[in-house]
Each structure stands twice: as structure tokens, then as C-alpha cells.
Amino acid sequence: MSSKPKPIEIIGAPFSKGQPRGGVEKGPAALRKAGLVEKLKETEYNVRDHGDLAFVDVPNDSPFQIVKNPRSVGKANEQLAAVVAETQKNGTISVVLGGDHSMAIGSISGHARVHPDLCVIWVDAHTDINTPLTTSSGNLHGQPVAFLLKELKGKFPDVPGFSWVTPCISAKDIVYIGLRDVDPGEHYIIKTLGIKYFSMTEVDKLGIGKVMEETFSYLLGRKKRPIHLSFDVDGLDPVFTPATGTPVVGGLSYREGLYITEEIYKTGLLSGLDIMEVNPTLGKTPEEVTRTVNTAVALTLSCFGTKREGNHKPETDYLKPPK
């Protein structure tokens, strides 16, 4: 790490219209209530909380074909992109608290305006790469990557609310980790475009250590560049993050999640982070909500240097009694 790391700006994105379930807009508040901001301030980073973005309802937001709430999702992402771009311009790491994963469109678009050479690590049970034509649900939280990829430009009609979006990443700039629920159309896209992925099968076969090694070699082998980590908490097994909208059994363990974030921290290249799909209203018990939120907090802290082996302040001699 450089002697003084970049500051962090926390941006709340309390948005739920990329999917049908209420409650995910309460994610940012739940993460803050669990002490995320205070705990981040205990790290080596300077932390500023931008607060939550205020999203206004778009009236008469009728579906586009089967795509639901297109104008609301498009407008909210446009707002988020502007704030993230401003944050990045100031040399700050953007930390977006979701909110549903459709907000990655704005988060990554805004980040790429300032760092067009960025790469994306997408941790998720799902690829979120359905297009408005391949989606069977019409929910935009299953489509953000399709809007971001240059190779899919022109492969689906213009969706109202998204005229501002310019695809900003190539198929070779993204790696998926944790996949285990991929639609046929999505599978066709990732195979056809040659997108690098580590489904749970690869995680089982290689182990998470090798997965991260290969991820970095693939994305950073030729040139070091900024990393955008987009982390859907459903990437982890529902044992650890039950309070989320689309849980899928057989996911990453708590330990594997922390290993991913510890390794990303060690590169010194993390430049943008999304912590998405925490839905405090979906836990079957209060304990399930707490477990999900605390896991999301732990993953975030790990991105900024909190290690399982422990931490100590470099300038302190802990064997000297305090005066």
C-alpha cells in the first residue's frame, strides 16, 4: 500500500425498482446502523459519508416490452453515475451501498468516466447479463452487465430511461466469481463473448486461492489498473446472507468471501465497490437479518484492510506501557 491510501466516500443507493421485492431500499440504513461508517473510520482510510441519494418516482413508468420500471431504474442510475464520477474525480474510492444490483449500471458507468481502463470483479450467484430481449422476469437487477458491455451494444432495442448510458467495459474486462444460477440466454452470452468466470464448480475444483490468482493474472497480468468490485451478497451461501431477494444454495462460504476481499485489498488497486442486495425485510428472524448485515459489513471492512490475522497500528510499540 502507498503511505497514504485514497479516501473513501460512502454513497447510499436506497433503490428497489430493479426487482419486485420491497425492503432492499433499506439496505444502506441497515449497514449504517450496524456501524459500518464508524468501523471504516478505524481503518487507515479517511472516510466521508455522502448520505443517501434521493430518488424521485417517475410517473407512468409503464413496462418496455416486459422490462419493468425502465424509466425509474434508468433515472436513478443516471443520478448515481454522476455522484460516483464526481467522487472518482476527487481521487476518492466510491463505496455504493445498495439497493438492488441494477444500480451497478450507474456505479460502474460513473467510475468508468474517470477511469476508463477499469476492470470489474463481479461476485454473485447470477451473471446479471440478461438483455431486455433474453430476460424472462423483466427485472432490471438481472440485466446491468448487458447495459455496460460494449459487445452487446445494438443487440437489444433502446430502453426508455437509458439513453444516457454508454457501454464502458469489454467482455475481457470482467470476471465473475460464485455463479450457480445462470439462465440459458445468459450462458449463451458468456460463452459466446468468452467472458471469464469461476462458477461454484471452478471454486470447488481450484480452491479460492487459485481463483483469485487466476482472476488477477487475467485482469492485471499485462497492466495494473483500477478494480471495481461489485459484490451481490447472494454470492455467498444463504447460510451467511439469508436476507436477500434471490438466494441460491451452494454458494461461497463466509471464509471464501473474506479471502476474495482480503486479496483485492492487497493489490492496492480497489477503486470502486458496490455492496448490493441486502434486504433487511426478508430475514425469517431478526437474527437472519443481523447475520446478513454483519456479513456485508465484514466484507466491506476486509476490502479496506481489516484482516482475519489481526491488525495493529504501525507506529505503535504495544510493548511500551502508555505514559
Curated annotation (Swiss-Prot):
What does the record say about induction? By arginine or homoarginine.
Give the reactions, separated by semicolons, that this protein catalyses: L-arginine + H2O = urea + L-ornithine
Which keywords fit this entry according to its UniProt record?
Adaptive immunity, Arginine metabolism, Cytoplasm, Hydrolase, Immunity, Innate immunity, Manganese, Metal-binding, Phosphoprotein, Urea cycle
Tissue expression summary: Detected in liver (at protein level).
- Binding of Mn(2+) 1 occurs at 101, 124, 128, 232
Functional pathway: Nitrogen metabolism; urea cycle; L-ornithine and urea from L-arginine: step 1/1
Iron among keywords: no
EC assignment: the record states 3.5.3.1
Instruction: List, separated by semicolons, the cofactors it needs.
Output: Mn(2+)
Q: Which SUPFAM superfamilies match?
A: Arginase/deacetylase
Checking PANTHER family in the record gives:
ARGINASE, ARGINASE-1
Give the quaternary structure. Homotrimer. Interacts with CMTM6.
Q: Where is this region: Disordered?
A: 1-27
Species name: Rattus norvegicus (Rat)
Phosphoserine: modified positions: 62, 72, 163, 217
Which residues are modified to N6-succinyllysine?
A: 17, 75
Q: Which GO terms describe its molecular function?
A: arginase activity; identical protein binding; manganese ion binding
Q: Which gene encodes it?
A: Arg1
Query: To which protein family does this belong?
Result: Belongs to the arginase family.
The consequence of residue 234 to A/E/H is: Reduced manganese binding and strongly reduced catalytic activity
Enzyme class, top EC level, equals: hydrolase
Effect ascribed to mutating residue 101 to E:
Reduced catalytic activity. No effect on manganese binding
Name this polypeptide is given: Arginase-1
InterPro entries for the chain: Arginase (IPR014033), Ureohydrolase (IPR006035), Ureohydrolase_dom_sf (IPR023696), Ureohydrolase_Mn_BS (IPR020855)
Gene3D superfamilies in the cross-refs? Ureohydrolase domain
